[in-house]
Amino acid sequence: MELRPFATLTLAVASDGLYMLGATPAGTRIVQEINEARISGPRLNATLVGNAAADWLAIDAQGVGTFDIRMTLMTDDGVPIYLAYKGRADWSGGMGKSPVFVGMEFEAGDERYRWLNALHLFGRGEVGEGGKLVYEIYEPI
């Protein structure tokens, strides 16, 4: 499979939006609200809008993190789009110590962005400066 760069996604989490649910059937469940997000690329540029953005993270007994992230973005030209992605990270050495690998999908109703509906993108995320999570996103070609 060949991949080409699609965009960079940078997220910041809300320090007051962390909810530790504890042990659940899925593992230790942590809900972390996202208060900043920006996706930047040659074909898509958008910023987080609204208050309904979070990661529903579960970490199993072996330290594997399973991510479930959803948010609404507003493109720079004023079109709302939905982004959802899931992925995994081997955090047996500690949270944030290894990359996060994800599969991403968009939903768009506006004709200018319907092309996003056909994509399944792949990302590699790392914890960067200031605790922000930075994903390099790739598109299969």
Model-predicted segments: where are they?
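Beta-strand-enriched cores of mature, soluble protein domains
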Residues: 1-141
